[in-house]
């Protein structure tokens, strides 16, 4: 089997780009309990993706993409991985620790350190924290 690979001269930038895309896609798949591709069909999700992309591009230095480019790349990944279930959703569904601390919480820490306001990411963290806590408490509904 032939392996298709490409040498990356700026690996740090590629890591930051993957981080940025994962900060958008992964938590949304948990919140909406869906595969990646379904994010394109959920009302309001486009708006959240745009807001997160703006916040990330203002917070993560040397990402190499404008917020518009990050939106485009995120949508490309959503399309290319349409039938995939994000690792965060898989972990959440299996009652395992998610990588939220390494993604959106880390983004929040960088923003705080640099006095950058990222309200959409803060809302995402709050929603995920509530979902995870309710799951840990064995509560599946809000009654």
Show the residue positions of the predicted features.
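NAD(P)-dependent Rossmann-like dehydrogenase/reductase catalytic/cofactor-binding core
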Residues: 50-143
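Internal alpha-helical scaffold of NAD(P)-dependent oxidoreductase catalytic cores
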Residues: 1-68
């Amino acid at each position: 089997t032939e392996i298709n690979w490409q040498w990356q001269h700026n690996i740090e930038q590629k890591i930051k780009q993957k981080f940025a895309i994962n900060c958008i896609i992964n938590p949304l798949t948990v919140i909406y309990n869906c595969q990646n591709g379904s994010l394109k069909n959920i009302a309001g999700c486009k708006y959240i993706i745009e807001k997160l992309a703006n916040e990330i591009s203002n917070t993560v230095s040397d990402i190499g993409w404008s917020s518009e480019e990050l939106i485009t790349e995120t949508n490309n990944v959503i399309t290319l991985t349409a039938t995939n279930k994000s690792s965060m959703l898989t972990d959440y569904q299996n009652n395992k620790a998610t990588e939220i601390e390494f993604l959106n919480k880390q983004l929040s820490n960088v923003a705080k350190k640099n006095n950058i306001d990222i309200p959409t990411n803060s809302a995402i963290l709050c929603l995920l924290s509530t979902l995870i806590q309710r799951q840990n408490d064995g509560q599946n509904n809000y009654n």
